[in-house]
């Protein structure tokens, strides 16, 4: 766990405690998040999950904005309970009043799509390729057969692969 991330989470909690003059329960912090989300606050589990790739690629802004954004969700939940909107007035109050940051709902980080390998299958009758996913290719290797819709012959792996 990067020390800067834990330090920023703690700083955000201390700012909130100073502002609201009360203690807040600290969350478990995890870097087990993938995909497009930069961070997620699990309110009932008191858990913060952050995306390690987006953290590495946007460290400065991530520490300043994203960490505060997610901590603000936990603070709002501990203060106001379940009956508030995720990015409602209470959360916005914390973002503006406590952290002096804009209450932005979404990040603008560039998210790289992962590359996908396609395994090219062919049929004797057709001039076209049949790109199979890794999972489908694996099933063929285990004995599953896929048939051409035109001639009903078994599709055969051409040995060609494409990365998309």
Curated annotation (Swiss-Prot):
- Active site residues per record: 70
Q: Which InterPro entries match?
A: SprT-like_domain (IPR006640), Uncharacterised_SprT (IPR023483)
Pfam family name, one:
SprT-like
Task: Specify the species.
Answer: Pseudomonas fluorescens (strain Pf0-1)
Which SMART domains does the entry link to?
A: SprT (SM00731)
Question: Can you cite a GO biological process for this protein?
Answer: response to stress
Q: Where in the cell is it found?
A: Cytoplasm
Domain of life assignment: Bacteria
Q: What are the alphabetically sorted keywords of the record?
A: Cytoplasm, Metal-binding, Zinc
Molecular function terms from GO: zinc ion binding
Domain (SprT-like) spans 14-156
Cofactor comment:
Binds 1 zinc ion.
| Binding-site residues for Zn(2+), renumbered to this chain | 69, 73
PROSITE patterns named among the record's database cross-references: ZINC_PROTEASE (PS00142)
Q: Name one GO cellular component term.
A: cytoplasm
For this entry, the protein name equals: Protein SprT
């Amino acid at each position: 766990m990067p020390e800067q991330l834990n330090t920023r989470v703690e700083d955000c909690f201390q700012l909130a405690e100073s502002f609201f003059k009360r203690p807040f329960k600290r969350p478990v912090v995890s870097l087990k998040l993938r995909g497009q989300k930069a961070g997620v606050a699990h309110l009932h589990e008191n858990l913060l999950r952050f995306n390690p790739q987006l953290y590495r690629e946007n460290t400065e802004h991530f520490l300043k904005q994203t960490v505060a954004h997610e901590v603000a969700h936990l603070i709002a939940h501990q203060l106001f309970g379940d009956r508030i909107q995720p990015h409602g007035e209470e959360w916005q109050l914390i973002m503006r009043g406590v952290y002096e940051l804009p209450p932005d709902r979404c990040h603008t980080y560039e998210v790289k799509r992962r590359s996908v390998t396609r395994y090219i299958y062919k049929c004797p009758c057709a001039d076209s390729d049949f790109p199979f996913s890794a999972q489908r290719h694996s099933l063929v290797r285990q004995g599953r057969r896929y048939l051409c819709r035109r001639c009903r012959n078994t599709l055969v792996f051409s040995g060609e692969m494409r990365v998309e």
